[in-house]
Amino acid sequence: MPKHEQYFDYVKINLASPERIRQWGERILKNGEIVGKITKPETINYRTLKPEMDGLFCEKIFGPVKDWECHCGKYKSIFYRGVICERCGVEITESQVRRHRMGYIELAAPVTHIWYLKGIPSYISILLNKKVKEIEQVVYFNAYVVLNPGKSDLLNYGVILTEDDEKWPYIEEKLYTKELMDVELGIGAEAIQRLLSDLDLQAEAKTIREILISNSDKKKNTQKRAKLIKKLRIINNFIATKAKPEWMILSLIPVIPPDLRPMVQLDGGRFATSDLNDLYRRVINRNNRLLRLQEVFAPEIVVRNEKRILQEAVDALIDNGRRGRIVVGAKNRPLKSLSDIIEGKQGRFRQNLLGKRVDYSGRSVIVVGLQLKLYQCGLPWEMAIELFQPFVIHRLIHQGLVNNIKAAKKLIQSNDPIIRDILEEVIQNHPVLLNRAPTLHRLSIQAFEPILVEGRAIQLHPLVCPAFNADFDGDQMAVHVPLSLEAQTEARLLMLASNNLLSPATGQPIVTPSQDMVLGCYYLTVDNLKNQKGKGSYFINSEDVLIAYEQQRIDLHSYIWVRFDTFSFDDILEEKNIQQVLYKREIDEFGTVIKVYNTRRIREDKDGFCLTQYIITTAGRVLFNKVVQKALIMEI
């Protein structure tokens, strides 16, 4: 069969009407027969290993198990495509249709959709202005609701009545007398459906808006205002999507295609099946039992109990464990419901739809790149040659080094020295994207200029770690190569790490020293009285200090005197509120004054002009000052 690509802009998820659910599952065959309704809980016949008719794997409803072959075996060829078998009623088509054809279960009694009853917020309770517990009592047959108060002064429309209510004995006694003859009480999901269908959304929205406008003092009744706003928002959503509130009560259950809930035969004749099949089977069994009880006019208390059990079975199918006991399978393992399949990290959306495998991407552990600039990352040679292979092959052919792709790949596999030079040319001005999961904000994906490095770890500048919320204790990051020129331009202009210095959430700098960098700065500038090697030595400039440190004549933390004539330290000392203590004052034979303080030594002439100035510091602080000064000069 020809395959047609379907293009779409977005996926819209909203409430489905009973007619829409029936439309999903129901089909009219060429012979006029309507199929789609599942009435039997059976899956496959244990003798023939073929699907049971009208069961959860029915070939008439969902399509043939084998391509171009019907259930009974009368037709076994593509030649009969589209033919409906006279014996079994199966359409001759591809087995692939079992991945998208749906069925439905028609319920003997309406049930509440648990997402809208027990979800946060509870849509049903907000629309009906009731507590969730009250709605729950009605749904699970523990309380009544007044659907029509009639002429009674005791009752009001929508009031919840339980057997513990003080009015209940009187109402129960007089319910079928003339006094309360026109009073109508309801119980179960049918009663909630009736209340929801009686709602006039347009009128409700108008009333709420008038209340909100008239209530000018916003400080009073803040909680009441918030409830009204929440209700108005829900009503507006229903109006905008053209959905009706009573659709939150289900009368039809859609059954997903059988190939999405498969049953697989294992070695030894046993079968492994999806948990959904067990949950669907529970619903069908209880639904069929309720139908039989209704047919034989069973007592109301028995029918109500069966309706409650059906409600619980549907709850378990939609969201197992949301309410009541968790339905378990073999070895007390909770069965995976539809919600469990959809939600969470391993769910359908995050795992299969958003988390797809990507070409031209790699993944490795991150380590510190000491020599890197902020906008650079160290890319391992092995990873780079794989990611940029198409560009390398193109360059090899373009330069005439090889004639075809096969020869180029052979040259790459042989690790020819020319490949490294070609790769260096290719990655120049070609940014790569680095992503660290979880991608919580836009700074979790940034662009960097790759630098080829040895080893197998990706090297990263430590200043960009706060943006990625990364550290170097085994974190992994993914690399992606933007292929098109437009993608490369966008990566360079918008996503380069040096262009993302501020947090989009707060506006505060996000490129801040942290962890190892802070520890290193602290270690360079800290006092350490144990390291006394070269203590008290004099140096003419900072270069001499660093040479002496490299020659191990002084320790990193030894206090030394360094000549520093550039400017006076008085302003800095005042700003830092550092007290100067004059230890000694001498006048030499030339009349120059030598002042020795706790932080510096000054030599002044007769007029008080500073001739030389030595400050007390350490080799670590000199090194720190030099690095910071160099970085500032480079930025300027």
UniProtKB/Swiss-Prot annotation:
- Tell me the GO BP annotations in alphabetical order: DNA-templated transcription
Q: What SUPFAM superfamilies is this protein classified in? A: beta and beta-prime subunits of DNA dependent RNA-polymerase (SSF64484)
| UniProt binding sites for Mg(2+) | 471, 473, 475
Keywords, ordered alphabetically? Cyanelle, DNA-directed RNA polymerase, Magnesium, Metal-binding, Nucleotidyltransferase, Plastid, Transcription, Transferase, Zinc
One GO molecular function term of this record is: zinc ion binding
Cited HAMAP family: RNApol_bact_RpoC1
Q: Which family does it belong to?
A: Belongs to the RNA polymerase beta' chain family. RpoC1 subfamily.
The role this protein plays is:
DNA-dependent RNA polymerase catalyzes the transcription of DNA into RNA using the four ribonucleoside triphosphates as substrates.
Q: What is this protein called?
A: DNA-directed RNA polymerase subunit beta'
